Curated annotation (Swiss-Prot):
The lineage of its organism: Bacteria, Pseudomonadati, Pseudomonadota, Alphaproteobacteria, Hyphomicrobiales. GO terms for molecular function: bis(5'-adenosyl)-pentaphosphatase activity; guanosine-3',5'-bis(diphosphate) 3'-diphosphatase activity. This is RNA pyrophosphohydrolase. The keyword Hydrolase applies. NCBIfam families: PRK00714.1-5. Residues 11-164 form the Nudix hydrolase domain. PANTHER family: NUDIX HYDROLASE 26, CHLOROPLASTIC, UDP/ADP-SUGAR PYROPHOSPHATASE. A motif (Nudix box) lies at residues 52-73. Belongs to the Nudix hydrolase family. RppH subfamily.
Length: 173
């Protein structure tokens, strides 16, 4: 059977994505560990926002808070906005079989924006809290508008939508 036909029959994995604004309106990004980055990903394009799967029976907002904590240690947040729509991306053909046990053609994501209200000492990525697996080797705050230029190519269109969705959402506390 043709791989392209198989791909089209695979479902999208339901996920959440998280935008965290600091008090200056900058956005938290983490640089993917080499073992999670794809072989041809340039170092400058290994950055991404926290994201992850929605567990069976879990509400997207709860999943967003859980994933944010598991990946970053961040719990001190205030919800700013939920994206109106779900955004999706397909995995590139070369990654099929290497990503998520070949069960999905890509991911469909509900995005949330939060205000970080804690102290920087709360952020823990390597290692993250509660024996979670580290996914990031570095983190930094960047301008929201810069996101599409620092992520892997097959996610750029989603990040453009995220920027458009949450542009102007940050308000100083």
């Amino acid at each position: 059977m043709d791989t392209d036909i198989n791909l089209k029959n695979l479902p999208y994995r339901r996920c959440v994505g998280v935008v965290v604004f600091n008090h200056e309106g900058k956005v938290w990004v983490g640089r993917r560990l080499t073992k999670y980055a794809h072989a041809d990903t340039e170092m400058s394009h290994r950055w991404q926002l926290p994201q992850g799967g929605i567990d069976e029976g879990e509400e997207p907002l709860d999943a967003a808070c859980r994933e944010l904590y598991e990946e970053t240690g961040i719990r001190s947040i205030k919800l700013i906005k939920e994206a109106r729509d779900w955004f999706y991306y397909d995995f590139p053909q070369k990654l099929v079989g290497c990503t998520l046990k070949n069960k999905y053609r890509g991911q469909i994501q509900k995005w949330f924006a939060f205000q970080f209200t804690g102290k920087l000492s709360e952020i823990a990525t390597n290692p993250p809290p509660d024996d979670n697996k580290a996914e990031f080797d570095q983190w930094k705050w960047v301008d929201l508008e810069a996101l599409p230029s620092i992520v892997i190519s097959f996610k750029k269109h989603v990040y453009r939508k995220v920027v458009s969705e949450f542009r102007g959402s940050f308000r100083c506390l």
